[in-house]
Amino acid sequence: MVYFGDRQRDRNRDRSNQKVERIIHDEEFGEENVELVDSEWADFEKFICQLRKRRNSAMSMEEELRHVQRHPKIKSHAFYPCPPPAENARDSDSSDDDDPIGYIDTLMYGRYTKDLGEFAKDEARKLKILEKRRKQEDKQRNKELLGKHSTRAKRVSSWIWRHTVARLGEDWVFLALLGIIMALLSFIMDKGISICTNARIWLYRDLTSQPFVQYIAWVSLPVCLILFSAGFVHLIAPQSIGSGIPEMKTILRGVQLKEYLTFKTLVAKVIGLTATLGSGMPLGKEGPFVHIASIVAQLLSKLVTSFQGIYENESRNSEMLAAACAVGVGACFAAPVGGVLFSIEVTTTYFAVRNYWRGFFAAVCGATVFRLLAVWFQNADTVRALFLTNFTTEFPFDPQELFVFALIGLVCGLGGASYVWVHRRYVLFMRSNKRMNKFLQKNRFLYPGFLALLVSSISFPLGTGQFLAGELSTHEQVTQLFSNFTWSRDDLTVEQAAVVTHWMTSYTSVFGNLVIYTLFTFVVSIIASTIPVPSGMFIPVFKIGAGFGRLVGEFMAVTFPHGVRYGGRLSPIMPGGYAVVGAAAFSGSVTHTVSVAVIIFEMTGQITHVVPVMIAVLVANAVAALLQPSIYDSIILIKKLPYLPDLLPSSSGMYSIFVEDFMVRDVKYIWHGISYQKLKEVLKLNKTLRSLPLVDSPDNMILLGSVQRYELIKMIEKHIGREKRMEVAQKWQKEAQERALEEEKKKQEVELKMRRPSRFEVLPAPDILSLRQIANDEMLPPKKRAETMHGSLAPRKSILKKTNSFNLKTYAQPMGHSPSITPYTTITGNSEFRIRSAFEAIFKKSTTLQDVQPDPETGSLSPAASNHEVEVPRTPSTPGVSKKVQLPAQSNWDFVTDQIMLQVNPISTESNKMPAEKDFTDKALSNNGDSSKQSPSIKFKANKVADVNRSPQTAKRCSKIRFANEVGVNGSPTRTKCKIKPENVLGYSIEDVDETTNPESLAESIQKPKSVRLPRERVIDMSPEDQKQWELEEMLKPIDLQKANVHIDPSPFQLVERTSILKVHSLFSMVGINHAYVTKIGRLVGVVGLKELRKAIEDINSNSFVPPTRDEDADEKPAVEKPLLSTNSSDKAVDMTVTSMDSALSNSENCSDIEMEHIKHTDKGTVSLTMPPQESKQSPSADKSNTENGNHA
């Protein structure tokens, strides 16, 4: 308030002076400009007030941090005991702007514009925030750099793996385990699906008297299961929605899809698929099983990687994923051979033959265990096929029928292409309707519930479901479609008639039901596949083809009731064979695979129709491939997954378009001799790049190799990390100690040279200090008083120079806190010594004072004294530490020492005691109180009495007792340890006692020995200012990659700039690379990744690719592109940073891993702030391409 009052008076005085000046000005120049002057002066005063308010207002946290970083203060030595060796530190008072508390020089006295208390609180708050950020970023850096730490459990697991599984063959055990796990999952899921389906049919059949209740029971269960599956999948892992084969096809191509191979996705996929198929919706499980097997393989690889590093290799991981795809199909249909071939056709374009045995072995293990589980738990008589058929093997078909089979393949090819087209158009229609799409996104359960209700209502057996065999499950429907008797025949057995009753009604015949069933499955499967739940597409199209083939077979049986004549022999028509051919042809046309023929043979257990099946599948594939892509490629296009498409044969530009037409020219690179600061800038600005090309210099751009991002970050961490910083801090401390010792030595030498020897003895005159000392000595115990008297009777020291004519006597050892007394001690030194002695006397007096309210039980020795047990009270090391001291601490300590010496040598000890000491000892022994309640004590148990006639050496050795006062980090006492050396022959056993004043804890601690915990070692680190300055200097140094032991890939994949896009596509597809560097005569000119190649191929296939115009002058230049950092920029003018994550100055909200400060060094060595330069604007395509290349490098 006084401060603001002074400011107000000064302001009024200034205004009065200014008003007088304005009056004089008006009298001289007239009154016409008075109003103008007043308005201008009012504006000026308003501006000054705003300026003062802005100056007096406290800066925000970000501004304060920037202020501190821009103007480093003088280095602190209060809490960091290791100053840097540089002595030309910047003075904090060199500039007025450097004063953080706003000191202003006035006419008489200085004045502070800020509250010191608030300033201290702000500083403490900033330090707390910086420390918190430092710890968080330290954890992030450890996670990125340090990787996995080896633990004892991992080492044990590694040892067990090496001596058990590794000896049998790692891949064999891994693949067998993968197959067994998938078989178990498939069996469990089938069991759950059958339970849901049987429950639905049981409810329908049990409520025959009430049709409406039957309808409710028939509809409610599918709706509930679909809603549960949709909600569960959406909450746990939305990545599990759909088939999974398109995603696996993309992943095996080298693209990393986030969260698609995690444990959460596995749980959501298994539970969601079980609920979906249990609802009775026309969906399949083959695609989801491929995804599930891939997830299991990925999780097993991570498990094995923890104690076997071979599975960390990306190529080995992709091999295991390829085998997992085969296991998924094999465990789903018990078809190992067809599963391997199907997974190869569906997921990969170029397959490595070395993975064949892996896929076959894992698929055979899975299929075998899956069928054995059916024998063990489903009462199967033996290992059988999934859809067992019993076609006659003598004449299964006639050659004339091959034409009909080919016709079935042609129709199925057209139908498969139309199926894919309708599916894609329906999905795009649902997406294009933005209003409906927005409404369905807000109401996620409305669309799945409505479709489930619609499909189950249509399939209700008492309604339209009687035309669709609605009472049958999917397995029963396929089994009956594959039956080897003619449904339209009149002479049917009871079992055959029971089968036909599901496929004909009183309103329709077998043909009508088959047509309705095929069309219904065709339409509903397309609609149901859009429900956001895990589902497959293979079983629905398999059923569609089986229904169409059965329809053709029944038509052939009616047309040729006696069979087809060939070579004088009639062969009967088997409609079941036509159903098998139709199922293989339609599913092959939709998936664009030929291996479905092998799957059909394994599922039916017969190869009687191998020729018709192969002919139909080939014709259907040929027709469908010309019209539409496969269903999985169509989903890739719909989801816009980053998969590399194929070049169409009709593309005319595949030979005239080169890699230089679509490569990225803005390449991020490093070079030999790059500084650590520039390297970190490159890493910071390109966080998604996992490798960087290495060139010789920014001028020549000769490609020398590539370096992984992890290696570069580890190199920076090694250069200025915590270990390096601690080493430098220790070195600085050592140098500081050496300098301090040298300075002290020089100072003593100078003092000795300046002092002149005297022949006289300097004696201090009696003063108040000496009188106070005498008064304090009288209050001391007898022994200490005798020692003080003995010390006072010692002869005074002479200050004369020691020569041959003088013999100085031996002087007593000085006290612990007193200065060393030399023959040249002056009066000042003696005065200081007397002052310290006076304070020590006061402290000793405080330790001997009685408590104001003494304990009535105080003053007696513990009962253990009668059993030769002695309690040794501890004297507090610092006055005032112990809150309650009942006995004179120093007297008790002398008493204990005398008791030990008495047992060692009682004769000599008793004879050497003074009378006062004997009286005190006798008085102390006469007490019967428990001294353990008074102060911390140490108990000595005399197990055997020592011999009286011991040597003085033994007595001296036995009396050595060591006390280790352990003090914690904050100065709090922890525990006290006391022991006698092992060579003690008395047999004393010393117990550790906690230093505390609680009697109960003391009693417990005396009875039970406790361990001793050593205090934490003090870590010597730099101050934030020193650390910042040191890191700035270290970051300016150039990098020597050879000394840094950085692993450099000397042969990264390179392409010449004139390589055609056809060769680039073939190389990327066969080799499986994700990016390649483009060179011109050895110089790096660009980089191409999957994104650029895919975009170019799509444009070429659509005839919309426009090659960029080439600049002829640019080709003549030696350097095609300007480097990321200009070559003329020196290391002294680049952006500086504090890299270490545990630095207090390396935290910022706008930078996640590495904070960068922008400063420049002047010629004088001072640091001045510069604004960060604006980043060069890149095209969006370049940024995206670099991001994608980094993700797949």
UniProtKB/Swiss-Prot annotation:
Q: In what ranges is there compositional bias, type Polar residues?
A: 1165-1193
Outcome, altering T276A: In RNA edited version
Which residue ranges does the UniProt annotation give for the motif Selectivity filter part_2? 284-288
Question: Gene Ontology terms, cellular component aspect?
Answer: actin cytoskeleton; apical plasma membrane; basal plasma membrane; chloride channel complex; plasma membrane
Q: Does the keyword Flavoprotein apply?
A: no
Q: Which residues form the CBS domain?
A: 663-723, 1048-1105
What is any one GO biological process for this UniProt entry? transepithelial chloride transport
* Classification via InterPro entries: CBS_dom_sf, Cl-channel_core, Cl_channel_volt-gated, ClC
Q: Ranges in the Cytoplasmic compartment?
A: 1-168, 627-1193
What tissues harbor this protein?
A: At embryonic stages 13-16, expressed in a subset of the midline cells of the midline primordium and in all of the midline glia. Expressed along the Z-line of the sarcomere in larval longitudinal muscles.
Chain ranges inside the bilayer that never cross it: 245-252, 320-332, 336-344, 576-590, 591-592, 593-604, 605-609
Q: How does it sit in the membrane?
A: Multi-pass membrane protein
Q: Which family does it belong to?
A: Belongs to the chloride channel (TC 2.A.49) family.
Q: What does this protein do?
A: Voltage-gated chloride channel. Chloride channels have several functions including the regulation of cell volume; membrane potential stabilization, signal transduction and transepithelial transport.
Name-wise, this protein is: Chloride channel protein 2
Task: Please name the gene that encodes this protein.
Answer: ClC-a
